[in-house]
């Protein structure tokens, strides 16, 4: 199975660089995975697709202002993107600079927001492949420093500086647990009134946590997808969520994941449970689960997701869920119908294809 099997041509003008004025004002492409039929709708029509007793699972991770600008104490500008906070004073980060800092190098960060001479210092203590371990020599916890001096880490394809409005719009309204460096974007379409309408309809709601890493934007750099090494992200699926999933399955209702990160969290927990002969168990660990055509989904029955990059692991996940041909036809239609793509773009609602295992490139 080749990466090129998941290519499609995307005009640059279809990349959404700003969100819609209202969260629910996006368009929605409904793809029935079983029949392959798709239909153009508006996002607020999603309410008609979700039934009483269904379980809607969201990812409640909260994006940290993870991008910092600064300089080496010895001179030379640099840009830092925090990938993972290790504790109150240490993190792993990507560093962009004309010359990579060496171990022991002192960095001065945040002066663009705090003023010249008011930045804070960090020491590069170790390198782990592409990531640098940084130690911040400040009394304040790292999360506080990022809130003061960090920028929202907009994805590279948005291709503009972050603005004040992104502080709100690049977060879901239910985000709670700090730790992501990218938003779980399917959730950006939901506002509080929509959540209240779902509850009033008798739809059950649950939250998992997966801290989305910058690896989600990394291109697949191999020809055969089986050679791809998936990045790891930390995920949590609590006992309470497991109980809700089991109760939903017992009544014959659907488990609906909001976003690929929710899918990966739930299916990671199911994969771990399989070794114990169970359907699903609580999960608190890193996951590098890679779902591509030929892989099975043990729990998730339907999916809300945005439109993803060509040749990305996310379009591979959608193809595994909806069927390869269904997915590529739906994407071709989305391009022709001028849907808006990627993080600030439009959404899909997909019913699982029970025959997806047989629909390979």
Curated annotation (Swiss-Prot):
Enzyme type, top EC level: transferase
Q: Which Gene3D superfamilies match?
A: QueA-like
- GO-annotated cellular components: cytoplasm
Q: Which GO terms describe its biological process?
A: queuosine biosynthetic process; tRNA wobble guanine modification
Keywords, alphabetical: Cytoplasm, Queuosine biosynthesis, S-adenosyl-L-methionine, Transferase
Taxonomically, the superkingdom here is Bacteria
What is the reaction catalyzed? 7-aminomethyl-7-carbaguanosine(34) in tRNA + S-adenosyl-L-methionine = epoxyqueuosine(34) in tRNA + adenine + L-methionine + 2 H(+)
> What EC number(s) does the entry state?
2.4.99.17
Q: Where in the cell is it found?
A: Cytoplasm
Database matches in HAMAP family: QueA (MF_00113)
PANTHER family noted in UniProt: S-ADENOSYLMETHIONINE:TRNA RIBOSYLTRANSFERASE-ISOMERASE
What exactly does this protein do?
Answer: Transfers and isomerizes the ribose moiety from AdoMet to the 7-aminomethyl group of 7-deazaguanine (preQ1-tRNA) to give epoxyqueuosine (oQ-tRNA).
Q: How does it assemble?
A: Monomer.
UniProt similarity note: Belongs to the QueA family.
Task: Quote the protein name from its UniProt record.
Answer: S-adenosylmethionine:tRNA ribosyltransferase-isomerase
Tell me what organism the protein belongs to.
Actinobacillus pleuropneumoniae serotype 5b (strain L20)
């Amino acid at each position: 199975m080749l990466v090129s099997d998941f290519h499609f041509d995307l005009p640059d003008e279809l990349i959404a660089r700003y969100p819609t004025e209202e969260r629910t004002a996006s368009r929605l492409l409904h793809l029935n995975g079983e029949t392959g039929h798709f239909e153009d709708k508006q996002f607020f029509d999603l309410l008609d697709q979700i039934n009483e007793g269904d379980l809607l699972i969201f990812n409640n991770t909260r994006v940290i202002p993870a991008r910092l600008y600064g300089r080496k104490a010895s001179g030379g500008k640099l840009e830092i993107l925090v990938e993972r906070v290790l504790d109150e004073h240490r993190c792993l980060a990507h560093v962009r600079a004309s010359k990579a800092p060496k171990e022991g190098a002192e960095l001065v960060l945040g002066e663009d927001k705090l003023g010249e001479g008011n930045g804070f210092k960090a020491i590069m203590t170790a390198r782990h492949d592409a990531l640098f371990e940084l130690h911040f020599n400040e009394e304040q916890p790292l999360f506080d420093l990022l809130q003061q001096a960090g920028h929202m880490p907009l994805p590279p394809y948005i291709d503009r500086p972050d603005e004040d409005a992104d502080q709100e719009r690049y977060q879901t309204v239910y985000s709670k647990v700090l730790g992501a460096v990218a938003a779980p974007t399917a959730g950006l379409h939901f506002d509080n009134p929509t959540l209240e309408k779902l509850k009033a309809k008798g739809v059950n709601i649950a939250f998992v946590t997966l801290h989305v890493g910058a690896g989600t934007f990394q291109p697949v750099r191999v020809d055969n997808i089986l050679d791809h090494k998936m990045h790891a992200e930390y995920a949590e699926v609590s006992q309470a969520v497991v109980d809700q999933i089991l109760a939903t399955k017992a009544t014959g209702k659907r488990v609906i994941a909001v976003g690929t990160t929710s899918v990966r969290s739930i299916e990671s927990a199911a994969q771990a449970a399989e070794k114990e002969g169970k359907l699903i168990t609580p999960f608190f660990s890193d996951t590098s689960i890679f779902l591509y055509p030929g892989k099975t989904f043990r729990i998730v029955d339907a999916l809300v997701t945005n439109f993803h990059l060509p040749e990305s692991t996310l379009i591979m996940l959608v193809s595994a869920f909806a069927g390869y041909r269904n997915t590529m036809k739906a994407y071709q239609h989305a391009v022709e119908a001028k849907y808006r793509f990627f993080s600030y773009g439009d959404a899909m609602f997909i019913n699982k294809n029970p025959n997806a295992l047989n629909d390979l490139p």
